[in-house]
């Protein structure tokens, strides 16, 4: 009786969209971070245009005060957690392994996971614009009177901020671990 032996090849890498979803390559993840930062920069820029168009002249021109405050809150969160931190992390993913002579980041799976938390967090954050009562209007400090924050939007905002912070902390841990352990 003859037996056919089938070799399993683990060298095959996914292609297409699965390459980007499952990658642990630091340059691919850095590219994903930079593209995400650019997309969020344009979304935050549109929010800034709404804010600036309202401030063009005294009085009400385009939006009511609640929506203006919502835009201020959302613009701050998008620009800090959606542009600045992902752009720095994306550049770090590209530059740090090259600068220290390492083959990759120290924790590549956590690197991938910390990136993929962000699209879900920002989906939650931006979905508050379409909920009853509109997006939370906490201003730059996120310290509004809680009696004014009704509906589901504020809990979604807080949950999204937790996810954005988790993603940022995981990216920072990966950067520090790479610098300390791989140099």
Language-model-detected regions and their locations in the chain:
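...captures the hydrophobic TM-helix bundle architecture rather than a specific catalytic motif
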Residues: 1-183
């Amino acid at each position: 009786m003859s037996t056919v032996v089938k070799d399993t090849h683990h060298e095959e890498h996914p292609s297409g969209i699965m390459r980007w979803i499952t990658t642990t390559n630091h340059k691919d993840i850095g590219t994903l971070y930079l593209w995400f930062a650019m997309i969020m920069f344009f979304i935050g820029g549109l929010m800034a245009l709404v804010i600036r168009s309202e401030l063009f002249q005294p009085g009400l021109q385009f939006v009511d005060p609640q929506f203006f405050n919502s835009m201020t809150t959302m613009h701050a969160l998008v620009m800090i957690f959606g542009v600045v931190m992902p752009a720095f992390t994306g550049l770090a993913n590209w530059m740090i392994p090259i600068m220290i002579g390492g083959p990759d980041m120290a924790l590549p799976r956590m690197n991938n996971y910390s990136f993929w938390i962000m699209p879900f967090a920002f989906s939650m954050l931006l979905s508050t614009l379409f909920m009853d009562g509109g997006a939370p209007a906490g201003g730059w400090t996120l310290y509004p009177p809680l009696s004014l924050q009704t509906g589901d939007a504020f809990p979604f905002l807080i949950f999204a901020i937790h996810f954005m912070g988790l993603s940022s902390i995981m990216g920072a841990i990966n950067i520090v671990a790479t610098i300390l352990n791989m140099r």
